[in-house]
Amino acid sequence: MSVLHLSIRNESDISEAVRQSRAMAGRLGFSTTSAYYIATAASELAANLWIHAGGGMITLQRHGARGMELMTVDNGPGIADIDKALEEGFSTANGLGCGLPGVKRLMDELDIASYPGVRTEIKARKWL
Amino acid sequence: MKVPIIRLGKVLLVSIQVDLTDAAALQFQEDLINRISETEALGVAIDITSLDVVDSYMARVINDTASMARLLGAEVVISGVQPFVALALVEMGRELINVDCVFNLEQALKKLEVSIAARGDRGGNRDTYEW
Ligand SMILES: Nc1ncnc2c1ncn2[C@@H]1O[C@H](COP(=O)(O)OP(=O)(O)O)[C@@H](O)[C@H]1O
Ligand SMILES: [Mg+2]
């Protein structure tokens, strides 16, 4: 299976996203290290859905011939200043603020689009 | 899910087996603080061998727990950080885990023994405790 939609409604859904993303990365041929990077990134993104957006959806999928994408979509309050959100240590929820900067380093590409109050979409990709 | 806390002489052993929810993390921290003051423990070994993926949230729970234990005068060592967990944490940046780490529980106990002995101060007064 190369597309998986997981709804993040409570804390235990986060671990499911972690498990599934690591398994999919393995099936797609990523090294164990890369699969751990992807799973850690999935954990950060799914946790953000739960903490900052009151839930949302994470989609795990193959991207092109040699990649994997983690995509989150939510209808929470959104991210007013994306550059700030990507800064090391910036958090509006008294967190460590290293989730998004961490995802950026763990993955090869990170795109964030946010229409505050309407929809936030985050895509993180990694290539084989 | 409760995190069991085992006493071994002047040291407490904790093994975190699964990702903790917010509520479970708070409960664990409270339990550990109570046990430290009850037993006047001088050291705490936190084993995370069973944790498969450690994100910044779990890293923070571990760090905060270690700081609390230190405030109560206990030395803290983390053991069992899995190699791939370590790689991912380093890649994420910052010193996400800010506590001394060793490979396994045995080394954790050795390290605690050494640092407790090095303090001399309180360890010496607690001659009722045995390993
Ligand atoms: N899905 C989201 N919806 C709204 N805001 C978000 C979302 N994801 C991240 N953010 C914002 O970006 C900030 C930085 O996120 P992150 O680096 O993961 O740090 P932390 O989660 O520790 O606050 C958050 O504090 C929050 O303001
Ligand atoms: Mg976060």
Regions found by a protein language model. Give the residues of each.
Chain A
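Bergerat-fold GHKL ATPase/HATPase_c domain
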Residues: 1-40
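Conserved beta-strand-loop-beta-strand hairpin that lines the nucleotide-binding pocket
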Residues: 1-4, 46-128
